[in-house]
Design a protein with these regions (language model features):
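C-terminal catalytic histidine-bearing segment of alpha/beta-hydrolase fold enzymes
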Residues: 275-323
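Hydrolase active-site cap/lid region
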Residues: 188-238, 302
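Alpha/beta-hydrolase active-site loop
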Residues: 148-168
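Alpha/beta-hydrolase fold nucleophile elbow
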Residues: 170-181
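Short substrate-entry loop that stabilizes the transition state in hydrolases
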Residues: 92-96, 101-143, 210-211
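Short beta-strand/loop motif that positions the catalytic acidic residue
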Residues: 254, 260-262, 266
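N-terminal cap/lid segment of alpha/beta-hydrolase-fold proteins
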Residues: 48-93
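Conserved alpha/beta-hydrolase "acid-adjacent" motif
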Residues: 267-273
Length: 323
């Protein structure tokens, strides 16, 4: 029975993806206001919060290279200790331009701090940016905490951004985000929650801006229909809650120039999601660039696609964060 059930579930997901039936779209009205018992699930709840508080601690040096020094860091986020790393460029006079790199999904219990993110972070540091990577709540080395609609991850990023803005060696008007896969989802949410704090954003193979579409993909494609939603809302009963948690319904709030990259052969996150997000941002009159690649979900380091991704990202950050 299980294989048949899984096949049926995948068929339903395919039909929903192709037809758009039952999915919240940018042109749909946002659902009526309702209570958010978590205080962190809905875009409106996240926008009403304050961010920051505490200090970024450089725990120890992880690596010395000719171009940058890498530090293990930790910082507070809603009472949680979050681990990460910071690449401080050499040969660049502060105050620094900053890029925060948000990683995609890896089993939180086994997330290795360095391998996933260093190819992007190191290239950005060599280009003269101070680069910071948070590992998020619940991941190896960080405290666990609530995370409905993955909003906890966005809170961790925005608390970090608020702390970075207070650093004397950082330009508070030159902070960018670079998000891959799930980190792209985290980034999109940050753009509608604190648009005034983010001055350029790069999305690479990003998960969607629609919480319902994301749940459908995770539940049916990866979890075989057994995905347990983290939070008090039911995907079956609380569709209005999913609408209120979806950045796609708040794109009018975006103030940040956005650059989007996606591989045409991506079998993890639908290529169409990035194309559709580009269209939606353009419909709202936002500044957006979109690049398609003959590549899969993660571009191999040193490949033509990876090299173009990093060249375009660095040029984009240079243009919008200054030299």
């Amino acid at each position: 029975m299980r294989p048949c059930r899984l096949c049926l579930a995948l068929l339903v997901l395919a039909l929903l993806t192709l037809s758009g039936a039952g999915l919240v779209r940018a042109q749909d009205p946002v659902a009526p206001v309702r209570d958010d018992p978590t205080g962190m699930s809905f875009i409106s709840s996240l926008r009403a919060r304050s961010y920051g508080g505490g200090e970024i601690e450089r725990v120890r040096v992880l690596a010395e290279t000719p171009d940058f020094t890498r530090y293990l860091i930790r910082y507070p986020s809603d009472g949680l200790n979050i681990q990460g790393f910071m690449n401080v460029p050499k040969g660049v006079e502060p105050p620094y331009r900053v890029v925060v790199v948000a990683h995609g999904y890896v089993n939180p219990d086994y997330y290795p701090l360095l391998p996933y993110t260093t190819p992007y972070a190191d290239a950005l540091a060599r280009a003269g940016f101070l680069v910071v990577h948070p590992s998020y709540r619940g991941h190896t080395g960080s405290d666990d905490g609530p995370n409905p609609f993955r909003s906890g991850y966005t809170i961790d990023v925005l608390n970090l951004v608020a702390l970075l803005k207070q650093q004397p060696d950082v330009r508070p008007d030159a902070i960018g985000l670079f998000g891959h896969s799930m980190g792209g989802e985290v980034t999109i949410k940050a753009l509608v929650v604190r648009p005034q704090d983010i001055h350029a954003a790069v999305l690479y193979g990003a998960m969607g801006a629609d919480a319902w579409e994301n749940w459908n993909l995770i539940n049916w494609k990866w979890a075989g229909g057994w995905f347990l939603f983290d939070g008090p809302f039911s995907p079956w009963r609380d569709r209005d809650a999913f609408a209120l948690a979806s950045p796609i319904n708040y794109l009018d709030l975006v103030q940040t120039p956005v650059q989007i990259h996606h591989g045409r052969w991506d079998d993890t996150v639908p290529f169409a999601w990035s194309a559709n997000l580009t269209d939606a941002l353009q419909e709202h009159g936002k500044e957006v660039e979109f690049y398609a690649y003959n590549a899969s979900h993660s571009f191999g380091v040193g490949s033509v696609a990876y090299n173009m991704l990093m060249q375009r990202s660095i040029a984009f950050f240079d243009a919008h964060l200054g030299q």
